[in-house]
Amino acid sequence: MIAILKPGTTPAQTDHLVSWLKAMNLDVHISHGEEVTILGLVGDTTRVDIDLLKSLEMVDTVKRVTEPFKQANRKFHPLDTIIEVGSARIGGGYFAMIAGPCSVESEAQIVEVAQAVKASGANLLRGGAFKPRTSPYAFQGMGAEGIRLLLKAKEATSLPIVTEIMNISTLDLFADVDVIQVGARNMQNFDLLKELGKTNKPILLKRGLANTIQELLMSAEYIMSEGNDKVILCERGIRTFETATRNTLDLSAVAVLHSLTHLPVVVDPSHATGKSELVPSMALAATAAGADGIMVEVHNNPAAALCDGAQSLTPAQLDELNRRVQRLREVLV
């Protein structure tokens, strides 16, 4: 349920109403817009006398929110959420380019790639330390050592870092990580999501390979319900009957998500296509669709990469892509 307050409602009136609602064991989320304030009510709202609430002097409108996701709902929070990560901003008209290798392989490799990422104009450095792989025999990442090397790369470039967590037991290792990524396979690992909700770190939440948009938003709700509203959604392709690409990039999800939620939406064309030659066109398409950012894989020697070399751009290709994205955004604005 949401209560839209009338323009000119004083802070004292708002505080009094919030206290009254909380006395009914409701969680109240306050969203200050340019003209009005919206109170989002979470809990057993059947106890609320809607007619009484509507009759209050400061209340303009009361509406029930029928969607199961509440805090992620644009009706609760009409203005776009802007998430700050270091000097980068994501959402609300701000665009982020996130780039880096699929896996951290060595200090020399990650620092070299990080320097190339920064030189290209990208905002954040991604890199895998813990790698969920389909095959148990594939490279699983460097683990804690990989995070240490990512921090070395951050020290060398000042780029904020993004890396994936796989289970709750390693959470302490992410204390100095700027953005924690939840991969597609863990999108519905609800225990993990709840623990991440207790942190104050931005969470990049990837859509599962066979999950609906509503399921993605409900996973975001798990994080937000624990107090962390710094959630970035990521479309990375879904599984369909098509085999020409690794996954099928659902670009319509960008527009649909923007209509349903205030959270930023980024797109990962590398995992969506699995082919480096397709990444630039899909990155541009995602930009045109209104994505708040792009996340691509980059390697200084893709042919020798320990994983996903086929979908990795070279630093020169990243430079060109970033230039094209910036030109496109200038036209779109």
Residue ranges and their predicted role:
Residues 1-97:
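Non-catalytic terminal accessory/regulatory regions of metabolic enzymes
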Residues 139-163, 195-202, 251-265, 311-333:
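Alpha-helix-loop-beta-strand connector modules within alpha/beta enzyme cores
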Residues 126-144, 299-312:
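Glycine-rich, proline-tolerant flexible connector loops at the mouths of alpha/beta enzymes
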Residues 95-101, 125-127, 161-163, 180-182, ...:
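Hydrophobic faces of well-ordered beta-strands that scaffold small-molecule active sites
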Residues 85, 224-286:
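Active-site/ligand-binding-proximal alpha/beta "capping" segment
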Residues 121, 173-181, 197-203, 224-230, ...:
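Glycine-enriched alpha-helix->loop->beta-strand junction motifs that scaffold or abut catalytic
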Residues 8, 95-112, 136-140, 160-164, ...:
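Active-site mouth loops of central-metabolism enzymes
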